[in-house]
From Swiss-Prot:
Name of the protein this chain belongs to: 4-diphosphocytidyl-2-C-methyl-D-erythritol kinase
Gene3D superfamilies (alphabetical): 3.30.230.10, GHMP kinase, C-terminal domain
Recorded catalytic activity of this chain's protein: 4-CDP-2-C-methyl-D-erythritol + ATP = 4-CDP-2-C-methyl-D-erythritol 2-phosphate + ADP + H(+)
UniProt-annotated catalytic positions: K9, D140
InterPro entries linked to this entry: GHMP_kinase_C_dom (IPR013750), GHMP_kinase_C_sf (IPR036554), GHMP_kinase_N_dom (IPR006204), IspE (IPR004424), Ribosomal_Su5_D2-typ_SF (IPR020568), Ribsml_uS5_D2-typ_fold_subgr (IPR014721)
Keyword ATP-binding attached: yes
Keyword rRNA processing included in the entry's annotation: no
Native organism: Salmonella paratyphi A (strain AKU_12601)
Keyword terms, alphabetized: ATP-binding, Isoprene biosynthesis, Kinase, Nucleotide-binding, Transferase
First-level EC class: transferase
Subunit structure: Homodimer.
Length: 282
């Protein structure tokens, strides 16, 4: 049995710069990983079968991103003659990241499966090839595959590696799940934030265009942010529901965590520019 990190991400900022004819929104965002997340346990099989041993409630196995990623890699590697005969896997997950939280849990799971099985099966696909596969599973998958903090543009697929400060974060889940379409379909969502260079954006105060909608529509998000903002700069990650506050030291973050209200599920983690998944491969 092998063990693989599937880290969370934060959007340190997120600006929506337009909407394409196909309905997808264009954006500028800054991804950074956390040293906190899910863990995947993978045991290679020799009978060509993929088994997910820990099903997710309400999600059919064939719709689960873990299974879809494994089957996609199997298909593409087989078609290009790079899949050793009988390659399969038993996969289980220790889930710590909430669904609908804006921490990238499902995308991270898919990326970990692609990277881990490519290694375990010895398929030999490049990171570029794996990232291209990942994009067909979700816009956030490629950044997890590439494994480095990045400035993202387009619909999130145009990535430029960057090295923002590795701060400590108190991340809080307010107890609601926010489906991404709920935010992106809201008529009051800002959709025309001017595009700026990465250098300009890194000098500006960070914010998230989705935050005003999440706070308006979900009182739990509003309450969580109102509490965090009493202590430190805080904002929404992704389309929510998780919010985070940033601190210069772990001790400062933990002092605030100790005062968290009982209704708030929170943890402290460090921002890291190299993904824990890729540290595992070094």
């Amino acid at each position: 049995m092998t063990h693989w990190p599937s880290p969370a991400k934060l959007n340190l900022f997120l600006y929506i710069t337009g909407q394409r004819a196909d309905g997808y929104h264009t954006l500028q965002t800054l991804f950074q990983f956390l040293d906190y997340g899910d863990t995947l346990h993978i045991e290679p099989r020799r009978d060509g079968e993929i088994h997910l041993l820990t099903p997710v409630n309400g999600v059919e196995n064939e719709d689960n991103l873990i299974v879809r990623a494994a089957q996609l890699l199997m298909k593409i590697a087989s078609e290009s003659g790079r899949l050793p005969a009988g390659s399969g896997a038993d996969i289980s997950i220790e889930k710590r990241l909430p669904m609908g939280g804006g921490l990238g849990g499902g995308s991270s799971n898919a990326a970990t499966v692609l990277v881990a099985l490519n290694h375990l099966w010895q398929c030999g696909l490049s990171i570029d090839e794996l990232a291209t596969l990942g994009l067909t599973l979700g816009a956030d998958v490629p950044v997890f595959v590439r494994g480095h903090a990045a400035f993202a543009e387009g619909v999130g697929e145009i990535l430029t590696p960057v090295n923002p400060p590795e701060k400590w974060y108190l991340v809080a889940h307010p107890g609601v799940s926010i489906p991404t379409p709920v935010i992106f379909k809201d008529p009051q969502l800002p959709r025309n934030t001017p595009k700026r260079s990465i250098d300009t954006l890194l000098k500006c105060e960070f914010s998230n265009d989705c935050e005003v909608i999440a706070r308006k529509r979900f009182r739990e998000v509003d309450a969580a942010l109102s509490w965090l903002l009493e202590y430190a700069p805080s904002r929404l990650t992704g389309t929510g529901a998780c919010v985070f506050a940033e601190f210069d030291t772990e001790s400062c973050a933990r002092q605030v965590l100790e005062q968290a209200p009982e209704w708030l599920n929170a943890f402290v983690a460090k921002g890291v520019n190299l993904s824990p998944l890729h540290r595992e491969l070094l």
